[in-house]
Curated annotation (Swiss-Prot):
Reactions listed under catalytic activity: NAD(+) + (deoxyribonucleotide)n-3'-hydroxyl + 5'-phospho-(deoxyribonucleotide)m = (deoxyribonucleotide)n+m + AMP + beta-nicotinamide D-nucleotide
Pfam families for this protein: BRCT (PF00533), DNA_ligase_aden (PF01653), DNA_ligase_OB (PF03120), DNA_ligase_ZBD (PF03119), HHH_2 (PF12826), HHH_5 (PF14520), Nlig-Ia (PF22745)
Keyword NAD among record annotations: yes
Catalytic residues (UniProt): 115
NCBIfam families reported for this sequence: dnlj, PRK07956.1
Protein name (Swiss-Prot/TrEMBL): DNA ligase
PROSITE patterns associated with the record: BRCT, DNA_LIGASE_N1, DNA_LIGASE_N2
Organism, as annotated: Aeromonas hydrophila subsp. hydrophila (strain ATCC 7966 / DSM 30187 / BCRC 13018 / CCUG 14551 / JCM 1027 / KCTC 2358 / NCIMB 9240 / NCTC 8049)
């Protein structure tokens, strides 16, 4: 018995602490699934040993104590929690328990709705005016948050229509839609501020601000799900009551449906679960409520929950596990990404053993170490990620995560430029992890323009070991190429000829083909026109590179380090030795570049020349050609069927040219 008492005390202490973190601090340290497991264990233990159950047990409480920073509000009708089911069998048992309670055979109609992952609130309307808003708190007493709730645009300050009770309490969930959450976190990251772990924390933290102006700046939403005070005047159907609230201006989830029996509930569950990732908000399950209010009243309540409702929880999207190691992968663009190797855990419907740690900043932000107990999240098809560390469970032998100084694939130095979050391998033309993409880019039509060298051929050449760097292309022969899939003798000869023809190019094309990070066609053209020769460019300092039009500090450093990386130098020399050449560039006078400093945008269909030809012609005259219209745009060239870019240009008062006007300008 002593072991049972000890476990009961331990469960109570853990649940009280975790509940305090969740409800009061808005900073949970364990996932919901862990809390649910402990609560179920406590309920089973107290069912087997009723003498252990006391009024202070977490099994008869809803949440934590209210924050002392807010005025406390006592709920006239308690805001209870819900019991949970986790399977079809448990759902059927829930329905049978209600029949047993009623002592008669009843066919239940259920009001089914998504279980939003936000913060439960109570809204009190007197004579149709919002006079008070409060959090659920511990179910009996909550915190007054009226001024903050008034800032939520989805919540009406005055009820619409007529017929509402003199005093009406609306209950619902304040939540943060996924899009708003992601945008808010992106803004916080850019400003170097702390980000929220998930939308639920964000909603709770936003609503419990002492300064309502902060709440007003957060993208909060609200769905009503029930009625407290005044509900007795609204008819005998829960679904009908919700629709009455909708008529009075309260928003409802569009997913709320009526279903018959446990089978109908299960079908609703399966449908919502399948669409979970598509919904614009986070949910962690669905809720079933007996629709008939007289049956609700007859079934009544237990200490912490109604007997006539239950939550059907989805597979947890967050779980706890151990971080066993960290490995570093190199992507096709050279990004070095830390990958967490986890003790396998079932989360989000699958067994997860790997999770992304993104970059060094994320590791520092999380404060994660090898050996830590971590919370891993998997939502839909999103790559699993570590969202928090359970620091209280950190072992004494936990080890810091050290970023490599050399590429784990090719051994080249890794670099992280100031202002960038990503660490990258500097061996862009050499690194095996980047090989296929580097060669595809090199041979592309806008680069070296190797006709017939498609992506699938490049992949075969690399997989068979025939090509390791772009320079190897120029030593291929027809016999080697003819051995590839779907490559006959004639096609092989044509490709050899195309590769040979690509030796003759231009300096801007060659620079673009090298795949230097952030160096597009326009920047390559500016570099070529500024330095005139490859030798001069290779000798340039960062300061000299900054003198080039549209080259900032980041691009200058990318170019500088790329041209000094030993492996890249080897490939560069091999390319020149293979006979790649271009005509000399003559220094252009200012009179030859009438569009210098001007930004053009092309839109619609051009009939007399291709988009690329028009772009090249404008760039040759000194213009910058951008892809989108902004206040910095000088001229929009509008071809046939010009769309939104033309509308925006007209709104901004930007000069608009027809194709005919473009031709006249190009001809001088």
């Amino acid at each position: 018995m002593s072991d049972i008492l000890s476990r009961h005390r331990q469960l109570c202490e853990l649940l009280i602490e975790y509940g305090h973190q969740y409800y009061v601090l808005d900073n949970p340290t364990v996932p919901d699934a862990e809390y649910d497991r402990l609560m179920r264990e406590l309920i089973v233990l107290e069912a087997e040993h009723p003498e252990l159950k006391t009024p202070a047990s977490p099994s008869v409480r809803v949440g934590g104590q209210p924050l002392t920073a807010f005025k406390q509000v006592r709920h006239e009708i308690p805001m209870l929690s819900l019991d949970n089911v986790f399977s079809g069998e448990e759902l059927q048992a829930f329905e049978q328990r209600m029949r047993d309670r009623l002592k008669r055979e009843v066919s239940f109609t259920f009001c089914c709705e998504p279980k939003l992952d936000g913060l439960a609130v109570s809204l009190l309307y007197v004579a149709g005016q919002l006079v008070q808003a409060a959090t659920r708190g511990d179910g009996t007493t909550g915190e007054e948050i009226t001024e903050n709730v008034r800032t939520i645009k989805a919540i009406p300050l005055s009820l619409r229509g007529e017929g509402w009770p003199a005093r009406l309490e609306v209950r619902g969930e304040v939540f943060m839609p996924k899009a708003g959450f992601e945008a808010m976190n992106a803004k916080a990251l850019a400003a170097g501020e702390k980000v929220f772990v998930n939308p639920r924390n964000a909603a709770a933290g936003s609503l419990r601000q002492l300064d309502s102006r902060i709440t007003a700046s957060r993208p909060l939403a609200f769905y009503a799900y029930g009625v407290g005070v005044g509900g007795e005047q609204l008819g005998g159907s829960h679904f009908g009551r919700l629709n009455q609230l909708k008529e009075w201006g309260l928003p409802l989830s569009p997913e709320v449906k009526l279903k018959e029996g446990a089978a109908g509930c299960q079908a609703f569950h399966d449908d919502i679960l399948a669409r979970r990732g598509e919904l614009p908000y986070e949910i962690d399950g669905v809720v079933y409520k007996v629709d008939a209010i007289p049956l609700q009243e007859e079934l009544g309540f237990v200490a912490r929950a109604p007997r006539w409702a239950t939550a059907h929880k989805f597979p947890a999207q967050e779980e706890m596990t151990e971080l066993e190691n960290v490995e570093f992968q190199v992507g096709r663009t050279g990004a070095v990404t830390p990958v967490a190797k986890l003790k396998p855990v079932f989360v989000g419907g699958v067994t997860v053993s790997n999770a992304t740690l993104h970059n060094a900043d994320e590791i520092e932000r999380l404060g994660v170490m090898i050996g830590d107990t971590v919370i891993v999240r998997r939502a839909g098809d999103v790559i699993p990620q570590i969202v928090a560390v359970v620091e209280a469970q950190r072992p004494a032998d936990a080890r810091a995560i050290l970023f490599p100084t050399e590429c784990p694939v090719c051994g080249s130095a890794v670099e992280r430029l100031e202002g960038e979050a990503v660490t990258r391998c500097s061996g862009g033309l050499f690194c095996e992890a980047q090989r296929k993409e580097a060669i595809k880019h090199f041979a592309a039509r806008r680069a070296m323009d190797v006709d017939g060298l498609g992506d699938k051929i490049v992949e075969q050449l690399v997989d068979k070991g025939l090509v390791k760097t772009p320079a190897d292309l120029f030593s291929l022969n027809a016999i080697q190429l003819a051995g590839l899939e779907r490559m006959g003798q004639k096609s092989a000869l044509n490709l050899v000829a195309a590769i040979d023809a690509a030796r003759s190019t231009t300096l801007p094309r060659f620079l673009f083909a090298l795949g230097i990070r952030e160096v597009g066609e326009a920047t390559a053209l500016n570099l070529a026109n500024h330095f005139l020769t490859l030798d001069a460019l290779r000798a340039a300092s960062v300061e000299q590179l900054l003198e080039v039009a549209d080259v900032g500090d980041i691009v200058a450093k990318h170019v500088y380090y790329f041209l000094r990386q030993p492996h890249n130098i080897e490939v560069l020399e091999a390319l020149l030795a293979a006979g790649i050449h271009w005509p000399a560039i003559e220094k252009k006078e200012a009179s030859e570049q009438p569009f210098a400093g001007k930004t053009f945008v092309l839109t619609g269909t051009l009939t007399t020349l291709s988009r690329n030809d028009a772009k090249a012609a404008l760039q040759a005259l000194g213009a910058k050609v951008a892809g989108s219209v902004s206040a910095k745009t000088d001229v929009l060239v509008a071809g046939e069927a010009a769309g939104s870019k033309l509308v925006k240009a007209q709104e901004l008062g930007i000069t608009v040219w027809s194709e005919e006007e473009l031709q006249q300008a190009l001809q001088g």
